[in-house]
From Swiss-Prot:
Chain residue ranges for the region called Disordered: 1-20
Amino acids binding Mg(2+) 2: 139
Origin species: Gibberella fujikuroi (strain CBS 195.34 / IMI 58289 / NRRL A-6831) (Bakanae and foot rot disease fungus)
Binding residues annotated for Mg(2+) 3, in chain numbering: 292, 296
Domain remark in the UniProt entry: The Asp-Asp-Xaa-Xaa-Asp (DDXXD) motif is important for the catalytic activity, presumably through binding to Mg(2+).
Resulting phenotype, residue 288 to N: Restores (1R,4R,5S)-(-)-guaia-6,10(14)-diene synthase activity
Gene that this sequence comes from: STC5
Pfam families: Terpene_syn_C_2
Keywords, ordered alphabetically: Magnesium, Metal-binding
Protein name per its UniProtKB record: Inactive (1R,4R,5S)-(-)-guaia-6,10(14)-diene synthase
Lineage: Eukaryota, Fungi, Dikarya, Ascomycota, Pezizomycotina
Superkingdom assignment: Eukaryota
Length: 401
């Protein structure tokens, strides 16, 4: 069992948006699709004649063709992590059950198969925080409230900078409390509190920088919503916004911490190292946009490349094919950047190789998690069917949107 002390000296909600009121109670209503598939109407379309059959690109090619490994601490960490987040947000039994199926610990387990139990628990809790935090901006109360979005980010930034008040588990702001515990943990060694040398100031600055990129993307996303520009943007503008708001940047740096990777400044600041981070973020979000297409249609989520290309005049299949081309181009961009990287020396290059492994595991884990947890499908079995056949079935009445 993994225990921690917060130092008391923050695509999950299953289609339900969480509402956390001043009494620290979680309420939910059908609103967005960051969790497992749970729509009774979906089963009404069993007749293939009523479905549009979309052929997906091979999403397990190139860097994604390698076998994944699972962290040996997965089972014990999952039990503790699921129980803790449900307690912190005072979730009801229905939410807690769904959260177990979403399985953020599995995602973290593929991301960092060799990290300690403490680091895996921190990564799983970061995933819980990120999805709860993000839901407020996606389809929640901040999705069209630019001032409110900027204010919530400012309060969260204060936590990261150490200028915020200490929150508690029974706080009126449980998402902020979760994030505060994460900041406490990431300042420590990934083996555990006081288990070894704590994180360097250099690394914590990088961790903060990655979160700032995420928050800049969220603000840009809300501004786009307010201006009603979701479908008037070009693909490049969409990618520029989504690679930030996706949250991949801080997740990647969090995984660096889990492995004890502290990139020297000459490596971390090299433009090609950042370019590789951009490339893998693009790959993750483009894969997500294909797999989540039906769910985004159902829930009215506009931030989807397939939907954007359809608004430009492409058919659904043409749009999916085009996104497949973009994904393959990510791999070309990756190998091109890799070939142009200089040698930094033995110690720095060792850290760089660890960083590259983290990047690959992050993309692979996100892909497998989408299929294996039924995140975007009726069930794990439906996800397995889509992976095997590469056929995505969309009700025709929905495909016309």
């Amino acid at each position: 069992m993994v225990k921690f002390d917060s130092g008391s000296e923050s695509e999950m909600t299953n289609g339900d948006e969480l509402h956390i009121n001043s009494k620290h109670e979680v309420k939910s209503r059908m609103a967005n699709g960051n969790g497992v598939h749970n729509v009774p109407d979906h089963d009404q379309f069993q007749d293939r004649a009523e479905m549009e059959v979309l052929i997906l690109p091979d999403l397990f090619s190139s860097l994604m063709s390698v076998p994944a490994r699972e962290n040996p601490h997965y089972a014990s960490v999952k039990a503790d992590a699921d129980e803790w987040i449900s307690f912190v947000i005072n979730a009801d039994a229905k939410w807690a059950s769904r959260n177990k199926r979403v399985d953020f610990t599995y995602l973290a387990s593929i991301w960092a198969p060799d990290c300690s139990a403490f680091a895996l628990r921190t990564s799983a809790d970061w995933n819980s925080w990120a999805f709860l935090f993000d839901d407020q901006f996606d389809e929640g109360h901040l999705s069209n409230d630019l001032e409110g979005a900027i204010n919530e980010i400012a309060r969260t930034r204060e936590i990261m900078e150490g200028t915020a008040p200490r929150y508690t588990a029974d706080s009126e702001h449980p998402i902020r409390y979760v994030f505060q515990t994460l900041c406490d943990r990431v300042k420590q060694n990934p083996e555990g509190f006081y288990a070894g040398k704590p994180s360097s100031e250099r690394f914590y600055r990088r961790w903060m920088w990655a979160h700032e990129l995420y928050w800049e993307g969220l603000v840009a996303q809300v501004r786009t919503n307010v201006e009603g520009r979701s479908f008037t943007r070009g693909p490049e503008e969409y990618l520029a916004m989504r690679r930030g708001s996706l949250g991949a940047y801080p997740a990647l740096v969090n995984n660096e911490w889990a492995y004890g990777i502290d990139l020297p400044e000459e490596v971390a600041d090299h433009p090609l190292v950042f370019e590789i981070m951009i490339i893998m973020s693009d790959q993750i979000l483009l894969v997500k946009d294909i797999l989540s297409y039906e769910k985004d249609l159902r829930l009215g989520v506009d931030h989807n490349m397939v939907r954007l290309l359809k608004a430009k005049g492409l058919s659904t299949q043409q749009a999916i094919n085009e996104v497949g081309v973009m994904i393959n181009n990510c791999y070309r961009r990756y190998y091109r950047a890799l070939s142009e990287l200089p040698c930094f020396g033995e110690e720095a290059d060792r850290a760089l190789l660890g960083y590259l492994e983290v990047e690959k595991n992050h993309a692979l884990g996100s892909l497998l998690w989408s299929y294996n947890t039924g995140r975007y499908f009726k069930s794990k079995e439906d996800g397995a069917r889509v992976r095997k056949t590469r056929e995505l079935l969309i009700p025709k009445k929905m495909a016309a949107l």
